[in-house]
Amino acid sequence: MNTDKLLVDIVDRYKRVLGDNLVGLYLHGSLAMGCFTPRADIDLIAVVRKPMDNDTKRALIDETFKIGPLPEKGLEMSIILEEHARDFIHPMPFELHYSPVHKERYEADRGYICGGTTDRDLAAHLMVVKRRGVVLYGKSIEEVFGEIPKEAFIDSIIYNIGDAKKGILKDPMNITLDLCRTLYYLKQGIVASKIEGGYWCTAYLPEEHHPVVADAVKAYIGSIKQMPVNIEKLSRFAEYMLTAISIEKHSLIGL
């Protein structure tokens, strides 16, 4: 997959639809952090100067459908206002959101728009943009994005793993690595990718949990097709990690 060509295509389409309203387009996630695989997704934040009307939102969704070929997990993007990027709000309001979860609804209902509300996940995404993001188009990250409070980031990453006990049995690789990078941040203050969190946990965690993390890492890098599901081991791992995360969170922010 030619990701450079794909990113150029994305930028061209966003510029064409949004015109002068587009402040910038920013890459976060695995592709920004140097650990992209074809099994991952492409993660984008777009920043606009003023609110978008529904016709413009729909036009951008239609252009998004034309982007490809995409990696296995597709493309996820959110659009926020410049004023909110600069003066951070949590949970963050957003103008428009697209991910494969919404694709079928967007295709079936041209009046459907995911936007005009708030998203607790965005604090985590914006922190990655701040610390490790890549400018695809527009103003620099330093010009556009204000500081993200540690408390908001922690709330966001813990919200993301809120259903980990059940989720790890359905999506063991991603939930395992999300738990790893969450604990990595709480212990070390490192805004890490999934795979970086996995590598750290293989050295940090008790030996009992090494096989679960090792399998997740192997699945992520593609050395095994998928992570095996051992309900007992995965459940014990999730319980251990959630307890460790809760302890570290309490020590950092007292909640």
Predicted feature descriptions by range:
Residues 1-26, 55-57, 61, 255:
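Helical scaffold of the NTase/Pol beta-like nucleotidyltransferase catalytic core
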Residues 25-29, 33-64, 74-82:
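Catalytic metal-binding acidic patch
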Residues 65-168:
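Conserved NTP/Mg2+-binding pocket subregion across the NTase superfamily
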Residues 155-216:
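Extended, basic/helix-rich recognition subdomains
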Residues 190-255:
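Structured mid-to-C-terminal alpha-helical surface segments
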